[in-house]
């Protein structure tokens, strides 16, 4: 009876992971060996505030969920923490910022963007891109520049006429 209950729990967990992985635009797998529970909880709290999921999952269960969701095949070994979400940039920034502070205990092992495997270097490059809010600010600045220059030009013309 106990084994059947455990098996049912695992089946439900895999089904839940499949639905969450299917909706995710990015999935990162990190080694967290030696990281304290308190620090892992701090990572979870930061991630949750950004809509990013963090979970320690058995490799066999994660492999089944990923395979059935259409992710490229990964060789999962040792201890892994899985982070996934919709914003590739925010997820990459979160992982590399956390990794910077915990070099010895937290390392990115693999990354998947849009269900395709990407290198650690690619994820690091994405982490250096501006986030959505910064991009919107840049775009707004570009859009308002012509009007700003026009108004400045008119003001300079007015000042020149006042001096004459």
Curated annotation (Swiss-Prot):
Similarity annotation: Belongs to the universal ribosomal protein uL10 family.
Function, in words: Forms part of the ribosomal stalk, playing a central role in the interaction of the ribosome with GTP-bound translation factors.
InterPro entries linked: Ribosomal_uL10, Ribosomal_uL10-like_sf, Ribosomal_uL10_bac, Ribosomal_uL10_bac_type, Ribosomal_uL10_CS_bac
Subunit structure comment from the entry: Part of the ribosomal stalk of the 50S ribosomal subunit. The N-terminus interacts with L11 and the large rRNA to form the base of the stalk. The C-terminus forms an elongated spine to which L12 dimers bind in a sequential fashion forming a multimeric L10(L12)X complex.
Keyword Ribosomal protein: yes
Protein name, per record: Large ribosomal subunit protein uL10
Gene Ontology cellular-component terms listed: large ribosomal subunit
Gene of this entry: rplJ
UniProt KW keywords: Ribonucleoprotein, Ribosomal protein, RNA-binding, rRNA-binding
GO biological process, one term: translation
Coiled-coil ranges (or none): none
GO MF annotation list: large ribosomal subunit rRNA binding; structural constituent of ribosome
Species: Helicobacter pylori (strain Shi470)
């Amino acid at each position: 009876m106990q084994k059947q209950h455990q098996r049912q729990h695992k089946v439900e967990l895999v089904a839940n992971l499949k639905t969450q992985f299917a909706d995710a635009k990015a999935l990162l797998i990190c080694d967290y060996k030696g990281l304290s529970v308190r620090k892992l909880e701090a990572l979870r709290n930061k991630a949750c505030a950004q809509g990013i999921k963090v979970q320690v999952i058995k490799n066999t269960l994660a492999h089944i969920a990923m395979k059935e969701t259409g992710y490229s095949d990964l060789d999962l070994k040792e201890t892994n923490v899985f982070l996934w979400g919709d914003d590739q940039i925010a997820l990459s920034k979160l992982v590399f910022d956390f990794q910077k502070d915990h070099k010895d205990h937290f390392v990115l092992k693999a990354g998947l963007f849009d269900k395709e495997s990407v290198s650690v270097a690619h994820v690091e490059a994405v982490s250096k891109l501006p986030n959505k809010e910064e991009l919107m600010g840049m775009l707004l600045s570009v859009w308002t520049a012509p009007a700003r220059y026009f108004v400045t030009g008119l003001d300079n013309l007015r000042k020149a006429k006042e001096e004459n």
